[in-house]
Amino acid sequence: MAIVKRGVRTKNKQSQQPSKSGIKKAEFDLHKKKEVGVSDLTLLSKIADDAINDNLYKRFMNSTIYTYIGHVLISVNPFEDLGIYTPEHLNKYKGKNRLEVPPHVFAIAESMYYNLKSYGDNQCVIISGESGAGKTEAAKQIMQYIANVSVDDQVSAGGDGGISKIKDMVLATNPLLESFGCAKTLRNNNSSRHGKYLEIYFNPSNYQPVSAHITNYLLEKQRVVSQITNERNFHIFYQFTKHCPPQYQQSFGIQGPETYVYTSAAKCINVDGVDDSKDLQDTLRAMQVIGLSQDEQDNIFRMLASILWVGNVSFVEDDNGNAAVRDESVTAFIAYLLDVDAETLKTSLIQRVMQTSHGMRRGSTYHVPLNIVQATSVRDALAKGIYNNLFDWIVERVNLSLQGSGAVQEKKSIGILDIYGFEIFEHNSFEQICINYVNEKLQQTFIQLTLKAEQDEYVQEQIKWTPIDYFNNKVVCDLIEALRPQPGLFAALNDSVKTAHADSDAADQVFAQRLSMVGANNAHFEDRRGKFIIKHYAGDVTYDVAGMTDKNKDSMLRDLVEVLSTSSNSFVSQVLFPPDLLAALTDSKKRPETASDKIKKSANLLVDTLSQCQPSYIRTIKPNQTKRPKEYDNNQVLHQIKYLGLKENVRIRRAGFAYRTTFDKFVQRFYLLSPKTGYAGDYIWQGDDVTAVHEILRSCHIPDSEYQMGTTKVFIKTPETLFALEDMRDKYWHNMAARIQRAWRRYIKRKDDAARLIQSAWKNKTHGNQFEQLRDYGNGLLHGRKERRRMSMLGSRAFMGDYLGCKYSSGFGRFIMSQAGISDSVIFSAKGDILLSKFGRSSKRLSRIFILTKNSLYVIAQTLVQNRLQVQKEFTIPVSGINYVGLSIYQDNWVAVSLHSPTPTTPDIFINLDFKTELVTHLKKCNPGLNIKIGQTIEYQKKPGKFHTIKFIVGNTAPVNGDSYKSGTVTVRQGLPGNSQNPKRPRGAAGKVDYSKYYNRGSNMRSTSSYQPPAVSKAPQSSRPSYIQPPVQQTQQRVVPPVQSQPKPQAQRYAPPDTQPQTQRHAPPDTQPHAHPEQAAQAAQAAFHHTAPQAQNTTQRKVPPSAPGSYGQQAPTQKPSAPSRPARKTAPAPPAKKNVAPPPPPAAASPPPKPKFPTYKAAYDFQGTGSASELPISKETIVFITRKEDNGWWLAKTLDETKEGWVPAAYVVECDPPANSPAGNAKSPPPPPPQLNSASQAQQSQQQAQAPNGAGLSNGLADALKAKKSEETNLAGSLADALKKRKGATGDSDEEDEEDDDDW
């Protein structure tokens, strides 16, 4: 993303709060293994080789083969299929950073692909380790992951563009090049006998894979003609000879592998775990995917057949002691396969053509016969030359298919290096020194890019750092490749070949003589007469001098090239052996390039390529030499741990930094995370990059210990911090979109609420309130026949019906519906009690849930089974089967539901319900023929055919707001007359619209981040903290303070509304406007079913009282404002100055008397719960505090000492006494009356004399309305207290008379 600078906007913007964090749904991983050891070696308590080895052993035996050292992956070859490369495992690593998932090669691949897309840097992975450690498999899995992920990203984005074809071709290179370039060795069944560097190129605009390229390094062509015992030739020869396609068997004369010398001499044809038939099918399929035509495939297999038959050419000695072909039919068949003259081919195998020259003149030509040894060498050179050129052509042909359209000029790449591992055999020759040289170069690259480069960078950037010693193998690389000041081994080989070009034995002797000069004063080299030792980083290796110079020549005899150039097959004469190759051999002025020159050039080019990329590292370890699973050789692994330098890597990683980048790149990447550097996606910072980096890190709350600032770069210490930054950046646009969506939804919600409010008001105006109409209908059913409760006669009482919220999509009511299996529409739902007689026991009053639908009345029971809530339908009573309902004439809540034909499963029920009148009303609506019996007694059938009568009496022993049941008798207090009517619903207090419910309640949440920074205090920008909000009325259980006459209040803290929203109180029913029926139902249910706790939880956390604004954060203390004073009169102008003595100073005013109680000011509005023991106060009201309790309640008294009550300690702050307080101005004349700006001052003015004028009349009317409202509030507020006392006396079981005990 390019930085586009824009000037700072002049519009004053509110500080944007971080978006509310979202938590992803947790998923249980069935395949997750138990963690064994540590997944990152930097977490080891002891840094030692033995500790590393022990940790790797534990994880290996648990089939956990991957471990991290920071961002370096350690892989131990399991020698078995663990099932960890399936598509399911691959999908688990998509879009995940390495800390979210277990260590895996897929995590390295994901990190490479993410860095490529995010930062635009070329990526590469360097896979190192000895032969058989699993390098090839790791490279294959990385290719598999990147190919799949890059294609999936483009397909999900809605486009393909041929990338699937590129993916298939990239993956097809694995089986094709493995067949032609890998073989079975003593250490590895699939050992790479060549080096391969695959680069996948991506379009930088959309990171779509557009092409690929493979670079080949030093094929071990000697393996074509000879192998060590129990090793094999290249895989393709066994695949071809064992399962040759039918069309090739006749035309190419292919037989079994035991027929040919090149495939049978090592006595190893079959390998355990290798299916040559399947591998051949994969190879043929890969050829088709890459795009090889049928003619090209025929020519490939023709060349393979030629090589096999060339190996079967044998020689005998003629009469002159020269070599002769034993069976000329074999050479004739080879000539047929190569399309050359048979006699010419035979002659080139047993004779050598030599030419002499004299200056510029052409000399003589000689035909020199060869002996058997020389002829065998020429035969093998022919086979090696054909296979080497064939392999090079296959790589070039694959690159031709992978190059794509080539329309994109600038490309980004991911490189995967799969190269031969370090080798130590009993006899080591030129191939081993080349392989080990390349591994030394890779080790040097690893050191330079990790250990040395990292420490050098810390010094250069002036970062605090403790240097760590390590072994730098540059001295070994110079021993092999150096030209000056002291020539290395490769230079000595080239000089030996140049000195004795014609005689290989003489050249070997010259090379042996030069070794003493090569290893002079070098501690890593030893000369051993015909052998020499090089002390590599992986161990000491002994090399044989014999045959090295001949292998270094790396060129075919001119005689053989001339024969092949005459082939009538263009694939042989033009493709494999083009004319320019013969011209180069003929030109005697130019020395042919040797094999050592090629490998040195290729290795240096590889190092240059890798140094231009951001590297990732995989260090592979071979656990044993037997290639058996679950076998761990401690000594062998410990040796690899030491020479790989894992201990030094762990030490540097623990002391180093996980991420570093230049200041400008960091700002360009993360400027969105700070409101000072980015706004709406634009870069608005006007300062330098260093300050911008500080602002970004400060805005993200990154501690100073997590980063250091260098001279040109910023260094992030832990990867967790980097992942947190990346996570916040990824979610930036999502949060911005969510913020816009919230604003739009608030706007729509506000319009919708306004429309609903208008519609509700209009419906109530024209048609009346349906819930109040239903209430009036129900009151008419009982009018004059039953005493009424005071709570039922409130003007705000309405029959809402569904008090449990069964109609909602979620919540308690919906839970009960789903558990009980009720699907019908609910008319009425509430909690209550039922009187049940148990077997052999007296009747007991039990809690139940009652749900009424159009057809049935359900009685729901809740039980705890093994601490789990079980909900079941206890009774299902059909509404049409109800004969009558029985009620008493008193104000109790009991009602009997009697059926026409009761059964044991559907009996008559005797229930206690706060909303009994409403239930009877709904039953009457559903069943118009229902009888309502009201009398002194209630009769119902406890069992079918057995009637039971309940008596009702009036007594003062009953609870004030309830009743008591004992032995078939219900005692209740006297209620309101039966002809009482509900007053009109009181109008809500006029005031401003509460827009706080439309505000963004998640605005105070920080941005989502896996990193949790410490809180950073900021200076407030206003006199009042922004996080303090007025209390929001909610229908939740309220806290009832104790009355003054009762003992000390319980340990219940009353916190301010901004710190404990869960304790916010709801308004009394008569003060809540019922704009929505659902909200009114919830409010009424919460009021009628409120029960006070019997005992407070003694383990509840106590919050010490403190001033508002200091709850968890630092807030400024707001001083109380002084009461308003009368306006001062303008002082008259001073008289003209005269020379008179100044008057004496006035006497000091007497200090105001100290009040007898400390004064406190209300920081919030406290409306109270309606209890008589509370003192409602308004904000800014000043009161006396006469008593302080430890439970959070303080006893307050108004300044005029006319009212006293309890207030929450967290709602008041200490302040100075006002100047007009009774204690503060007792000895001074009272000032003019202040303006009415508080509740206490309003009460004082109410007690003053009333003036008989219009103003006094209006004030009196206002006072009367306030008094009426206060009275109704107190009446409604005592509802919960009445219900609490009423229910408290009826919770236990009671004994019935003896008549009930014989029910069983």
From Swiss-Prot:
The myosin motor domain displays actin-stimulated ATPase activity and generates a mechanochemical force. The tail domain participates in molecular interactions that specify the role of the motor domain. It is composed of several tail homology (TH) domains, namely a putative phospholipid-binding myosin tail domain (also named TH1), an Ala- and Pro-rich domain (TH2), followed by an SH3 domain and a C-terminal acidic domain (TH3). Residues 964-983, 1001-1012 have a biased composition (Polar residues). It comes from Debaryomyces hansenii (strain ATCC 36239 / CBS 767 / BCRC 21394 / JCM 1990 / NBRC 0083 / IGC 2968). Residues 1141-1156 have a biased composition (Pro residues). Gene3D superfamilies: 1.10.10.820, 1.20.5.4820, 1.20.58.530, Kinesin motor domain (3.40.850.10), Myosin VI head, motor domain, U50 subdomain (1.20.120.720), SH3 Domains (2.30.30.40). Keywords: Actin-binding, ATP-binding, Cytoplasm, Cytoskeleton, Hydrolase, Motor protein, Myosin, Nucleotide-binding, Phosphoprotein, Repeat, SH3 domain. ATP binds at G129, E130, S131, G132, A133, G134, K135, T136. Phosphorylation of the TEDS site (Ser-364) is required for the polarization of the actin cytoskeleton. Phosphorylation probably activates the myosin-I ATPase activity. Residues 1292-1304 have a biased composition (Acidic residues). This is Myosin-1.
